[in-house]
Each structure stands twice: as structure tokens, then as C-alpha cells.
A protein has these predicted regions:
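Non-catalytic, usually N-terminal nucleic-acid engagement modules in DNA/RNA processing proteins
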Residues: 2-86, 93-95, 103-104
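Eukaryote-skewed repeat-based solenoidal scaffolds used as protein-protein interaction platforms
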Residues: 72-146
Length: 146
């Protein structure tokens, strides 16, 4: 176990993403709370990679990650770095790291967990979150949607 100079254990698994979360019963996916979800639909939507280079006002724009994973992998690697960016936006459509039905189930579950963990984290930071409903094989649907 690695501790820094302040004797704090390094959070290499990014447990901070789900700090304060409630979890589903079996797989313990973090639950996106109802107060994180906006009442009104988005007026505008822009992909993350386009929004990063956009020099205009993003205050009425929801950011989505419907693109190749490599265009937004940087968020998963360093979520704190993008806090200020997402604060400039109207909200986030839940993350969409790829889940394919031919992936090993453990990898599907890991991707589902990352999608929900990041969505929860940014929701807790008072960003509006529109949950992204994405699961792999049908057998995973009940737990994911609980």
C-alpha cells in the first residue's frame, strides 16, 4: 500500500468518484440520484471533443460522449481536470464508454461501472446529468436499471 507524504493512501482506483453514492443491491453500481437529473430536456447537445475546442458560450449546451472512446478517455484518466470545463456547460449526458455484447461479462460490468461512476461524480459536483442507459447483454439489464 502506497502512502503519500501526508500518510494518505493513494486512490489509484478512483474511489472518490462514488463517495457518498447509494449502490444497486447486487453489483453495487452507483445510483444516479433524482436531484442530479434535470426536469427539462437539453436545448443543445455537443460532443465532448468538439466542445473542448469551442470558444463560444456553453452554458446552454449538454455534453455527450457519443464518439469513439479514445476521444474522451482522458476524462476517465483524470476526472478532476475537467470539473471547471463541465461547470461551464448546462449538463452532461451520462458517459458512454463502449459496452459490446461480445465483450467478456466482467469487462461489460467494468465499463458500466465507469459510465455510472463518472456520471455520479459530476452529478455530485452539481452538474445536471441525463443518465445514459447502456448495458451489454440482456442479463445485465435488471441490475443496471435497478
Amino acid at each position: 500500500m502506497y502512502k503519500d507524504k501526508n500518510n494518505v493512501v493513494e486512490d489509484s482506483f478512483q474511489a472518490f468518484l462514488v463517495d457518498g453514492a447509494n449502490f444497486t443491491k447486487n453489483e453495487e453500481y452507483p445510483i444516479i440520484e433524482s436531484w442530479m437529473i434535470p426536469k427539462l430536456p437539453p436545448k443543445k447537445i455537443m460532443p465532448f471533443d468538439k466542445a473542448l475546442n469551442y470558444h463560444g458560450d456553453l452554458s446552454d449546451v449538454y455534453i455527450c460522449t457519443y464518439a469513439r472512446d479514445c476521444t474522451f478517455e482522458r476524462i476517465r484518466k483524470n476526472p478532476k481536470r475537467y470539473l471547471n470545463f463541465f461547470k461551464r456547460c448546462a449538463g452532461i449526458i451520462g458517459f458512454d464508454y463502449s459496452i459490446h455484447s461480445d465483450m467478456p461479462i466482467v469487462k461489460q460490468k467494468a465499463q458500466m461501472n465507469d459510465n455510472l461512476s463518472l456520471s455520479f461524480y459530476y452529478g455530485k459536483q452539481e452538474n445536471n446529468i441525463i443518465p445514459n442507459i447502456r448495458y451489454g447483454i440482456d442479463e445485465l439489464a435488471d441490475e443496471y436499471l435497478s
